[in-house]
UniProtKB/Swiss-Prot annotation:
Keyword line: Cytoplasm, Methyltransferase, rRNA processing, S-adenosyl-L-methionine, Transferase
Listed GO CC annotations: cytosol
Binding-site list for S-adenosyl-L-methionine: G196, I216, L225
Matches recorded under SUPFAM superfamilies: alpha/beta knot (SSF75217), L30e-like (SSF55315)
Keyword Methyltransferase: yes
SMART domains: SpoU_sub_bind
Family indicated by similarity: Belongs to the class IV-like SAM-binding methyltransferase superfamily. RNA methyltransferase TrmH family. RlmB subfamily.
Organism of this sequence: Salmonella typhi
Protein name: 23S rRNA (guanosine-2'-O-)-methyltransferase RlmB
Lineage: Bacteria, Pseudomonadati, Pseudomonadota, Gammaproteobacteria, Enterobacterales
Length: 243
């Protein structure tokens, strides 16, 4: 069993973290890119078989996405399960979690993972039935974060949120109609940030299980932000308060 990853950053990040997972790599024939050369040398030094391929082959393997002239076939990484969450929480005095409710676009999932990694989030939680898959597109956008931040899919998000509350984790949800902003919120301790789907927001049951609702103040004419942008803003305000 194997999976494909593509893009310079995604391949490089996995090679640095888990070179043993690589089975083979495909490089665009005739591609002269200074960014690719060090990566090719690094792959060769790890004994990875490298094959030259035409653009049509790479486009097909990446479903027409921007692959930057490199694709790798790798062994699947660790798949975190719902029952791994308590152990992950126990590793930290102040767990810092991100919950994505209804983020179904793999580009947004990848961007949220990238922001989560940069902010030091310990795990990202998503519902099994209403979330984008962690496919090659999401991994490319994540620029390596998909290999470092545990992504946990849960069967019942509301039940998981209750479990977090039993672990004394404060759950902060985002909603445009919230009566105070993230800058008025207190987020220095054990916490989980909940982001809803773009346009729709959190589902009713998810919202009801939040301890607090916050909004992002908007000064211009637009009514909302892309979910990955909003996630980054909220995460780094939490980081500011936690440091």
């Amino acid at each position: 069993m194997s999976e494909m990853i593509y893009g310079i950053h995604a391949v490089q990040a996995l090679l640095e973290r888990a070179p043993e997972r690589f089975q083979e790599a495909f490089i665009l024939k005739g591609r002269e890119d200074k960014r690719l050369l060090p990566l090719i040398h690094a792959l060769e030094s790890q004994g990875v078989v490298i094959q030259l391929a035409n653009r049509q082959y790479l486009d097909e393997k990446s479903d027409g996405a921007v692959h930057q002239g490199i694709i790798a076939r790798v062994k699947p990484g660790r798949q975190y399960q719902e029952n791994d969450l308590p152990d992950l929480i126990a590793l930290h005095d102040r767990p810092f979690l991100l919950i994505l409710d209804g983020v179904t676009d793999p580009h947004n999932l990848g961007a949220c993972l990238r922001s989560a990694d940069a902010a030091g989030v310990h795990a990202v939680i998503v519902p099994k039935d209403r979330s984008a898959q962690l496919n090659a597109t999401a991994k490319k956008v994540a620029c390596g974060a998909a290999e470092s931040v545990p992504l946990i899919r849960v069967t019942n998000l509301a039940r998981t949120m209750r479990m977090l509350q039993e672990e004394n984790i404060w759950i902060v949800g985002t909603a445009g109609e919230a009566d105070h902003t993230l800058y008025q919120s207190k987020m220095p301790g054990r916490m989980a940030l909940v982001m809803g789907a773009e346009g729709e927001g959190m589902r009713r049951l998810t919202r009801e299980h939040c301890d607090e609702l916050i909004s992002i103040p908007m000064a211009g004419s637009v009514s909302s932000l892309n979910v990955s942008v909003a996630t980054g803003i909220c995460l780094f305000e939490a980081v500011r308060q936690r440091t």
